[in-house]
């Protein structure tokens, strides 16, 4: 089973917790339910007037948390401003940014391209020159060639060359040739934050150029909630002798750079200053460098030709990753005081682990000596990493448990094999001691049903984790259009980081699919032990599982499941359905069903829409009779 968790700190002054929260904070050790507790029987709690929607019998409030969000320090186009904007638009009160740790650190970043070939080796793989869609109708003489020995004098590397681009249109309109320097097969190590890195590229214009026909370098930046994806095109112009003001249309900016025809010129964009000049309302530091595209744009009259050489990204030796990351988070905390934005980070070892809240830190990875495998370490390092997250007062999440593949989830025998393999792995590793697992997840190697079955396997084998729902969004726009748009719905005593971490550690959270369900769900045994907790009393025929649900969509069905804690490994007894309830059954907020069985068990429920698709689910509540061979974490134990 997974390891126990530390005791929660006392609630903030001014807040009260009922006996439920007092009882669960017993200590850091697990509690093996003793036979001496058999006399501590109590009748089911008396019925009480239902609380108003959004609150519960424990004086907790339901919140929405968007977790596992990648922004400008990661490898795609997300920005924290985009996530914040989407959170506000969708009524989400908790935003947990979790960029990759090694990308924030620029670990094994840098990189050079010498234009000696269409692909060049790097310490982590390969950078490549990839043709991108052009514009217009190009002549047959247009295109790209590598010029051996044609490198800029600054590149003294043996075999260094240059890329010649030629663009001429068959029509009066312009035509464009475009090639990207791509690092996808090198851990995407050219992509990431604009902070701490300086781009250099040498260019020689062999033809005249102007605002219409030119050589250019186009840099893709992060998404902006107001402008969409941003990009800056640096036009190299022989008709200018001095820089001009940028021209900006929405997310597209153009900066003209004077150059001399026939002479090498080193382009070194000052990205922070340029972003600030182009989009004054945006935070420049909340931007990433996502693409580097080399351009030649010509027309029928003017053939544009020129050379590109020695592209290299240098890491600033004064770059402070901790300060850089913290400053971006703090900017949005100050600007959005109504949101909770705790520290977060995805520590990206073999099995990625998110730190949710706590003090920011960077794990000291062992040096493998091989940059291409610098995130591959094994279970011992993963377990130590989780312990370090917890030592820094963070909640540790086991992320996308079926891996990082982005292909469609497997079906048939391949799906069964993937499930069996991962069940075996998490049982053997005890989830490395993590507090949570991403179960609300519908991609990366498995569908939602498979994630739920994996979590049932853990529950049936006596492992106490909290199931969360996440998006793993790297783009930061239009959350409702995403397939993987799960949010975690924690019950909290106030919108504070400590209350949030308590909910995650104790299992006081359900999961919903944003746009389909973001109400509130809870369940309990006799209104004594609630979702995430273990009811540790002698079973009684009068015991009831009580289901609370608010905000159910019309036509929804709630299905209650019960499963035995049988320690059956991957062959555990799958949970069985106890009852279905229509949405109208919850007119007063709750329904109940008899707690069946005599041995240790767990109960959870799902919400299906009118078409039968699961749109929400709860964490389990446990029924662990005295004398059961189940080690209950002290913070989940209810005598």
Task: Please describe what each predicted stretch is.
Residues 49-62, 70, 74, 80-84, ...:
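C-terminal functional module detector
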Residues 179-183, 192, 200-277:
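Extracellular ligand-binding interfaces
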Residues 201, 264-307:
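Extracellular beta-strand ligand-recognition surfaces/modules
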Residues 145-178:
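Short carbohydrate-recognition loop motifs
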Residues 113-145, 317-318:
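Extracellular carbohydrate-recognition regions
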Residues 27, 316, 345, 362, ...:
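Domain-core and long-helix interface of multi-subunit machines
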């Amino acid at each position: 089973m997974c390891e126990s968790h530390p005791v929660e700190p006392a609630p903030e002054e001014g807040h009260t917790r009922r006996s439920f929260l007092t009882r669960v904070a017993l200590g850091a050790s697990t509690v093996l339910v003793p036979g001496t507790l058999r006399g501590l029987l109590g009748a089911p709690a008396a019925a009480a007037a239902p609380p108003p929607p959004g609150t519960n019998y424990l004086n907790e409030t339901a919140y929405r948390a968007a977790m596992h969000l990648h922004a400008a320090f990661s490898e795609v186009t997300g920005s924290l401003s985009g996530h914040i904007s989407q959170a506000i638009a969708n009524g989400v009160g908790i935003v947990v940014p979790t960029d990759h740790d090694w990308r924030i650190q620029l670990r094994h970043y840098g990189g050079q391209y010498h234009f000696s070939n269409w692909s060049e080796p790097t310490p982590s793989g390969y950078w490549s020159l990839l043709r991108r869609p052009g514009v217009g109708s190009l002549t047959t003489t247009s295109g790209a060639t590598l010029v051996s020995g044609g490198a800029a004098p600054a590149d003294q590397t043996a075999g260094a060359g240059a890329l010649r681009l030629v663009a001429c249109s068959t029509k009066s309109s312009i035509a464009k040739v475009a090639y990207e320097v791509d690092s996808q097969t090198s851990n995407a190590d050219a992509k990431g934050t604009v902070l701490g890195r300086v781009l250099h590229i040498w260019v020689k214009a062999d033809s005249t150029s102007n605002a219409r026909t030119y050589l250019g370098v186009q840099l893709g930046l992060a998404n902006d909630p107001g402008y969409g994806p941003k990009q800056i095109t640096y036009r190299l112009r022989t008709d200018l002798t001095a820089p001009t003001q940028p021209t900006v249309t929405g997310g597209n900016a153009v900066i003209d750079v004077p150059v001399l025809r026939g002479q090498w010129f080193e382009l070194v964009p000052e990205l922070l200053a340029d972003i600030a000049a182009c989009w004054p309302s945006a935070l420049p530091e909340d931007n990433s460098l996502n693409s580097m595209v080399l351009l030649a744009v010509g027309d029928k009259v003017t053939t544009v030709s020129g050379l590109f050489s020695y592209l290299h990204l240098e890491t600033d030796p004064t770059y402070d990753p901790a300060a850089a990351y913290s400053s971006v988070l703090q900017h949005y905390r100050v600007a959005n005081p109504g949101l909770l934005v705790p520290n977060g980070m995805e520590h990206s070892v073999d099995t990625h682990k998110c730190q949710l809240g706590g003090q920011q830190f960077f794990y000291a990875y062992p040096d493998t000596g091989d940059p291409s495998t610098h995130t591959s370490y094994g279970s011992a390092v993963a377990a130590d990493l989780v312990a370090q997250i917890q030592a820094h007062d963070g909640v540790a999440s086991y992320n996308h448990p079926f891996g990082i593949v982005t292909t469609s989830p497997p079906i048939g025998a391949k799906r069964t094999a993937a499930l069996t393999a991962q069940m075996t792995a998490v049982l053997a590793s005890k989830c490395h001691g993590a507090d949570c697992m991403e179960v609300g997840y519908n991609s990366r190697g498995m569908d939602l049903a498979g994630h739920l079955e994996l979590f049932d396997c853990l529950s049936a084998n006596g492992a106490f984790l909290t199931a969360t729902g996440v998006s793993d969004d790297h783009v930061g726009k239009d959350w409702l259009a995403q397939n993987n748009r799960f949010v975690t719905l924690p019950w909290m005593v106030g919108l504070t980081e400590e209350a949030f971490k308590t909910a995650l550690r104790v299992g006081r959270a359900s999961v919903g699919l944003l746009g389909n369900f973001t109400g509130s769900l809870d369940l309990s045994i006799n209104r004594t032990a609630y979702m995430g907790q273990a009811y540790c009393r002698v079973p009684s025929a009068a015991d009831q599982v009580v289901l609370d649900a608010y905000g159910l969509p019309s036509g929804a069905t709630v299905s209650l499941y019960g499963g035995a804690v049988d320690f059956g490994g991957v062959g555990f007894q799958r949970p069985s359905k106890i009852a279905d309830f229509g949405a109208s059954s919850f007119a007063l907020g709750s329904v109940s069903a008899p707690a069946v069985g005599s041995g240790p068990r767990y109960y959870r429920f799902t919400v299906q829409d009118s078409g039968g698709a699961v749109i929400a689910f709860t964490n389990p509540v446990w029924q662990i009779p005295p004398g059961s061979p189940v080690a209950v974490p002290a913070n989940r134990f209810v005598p």
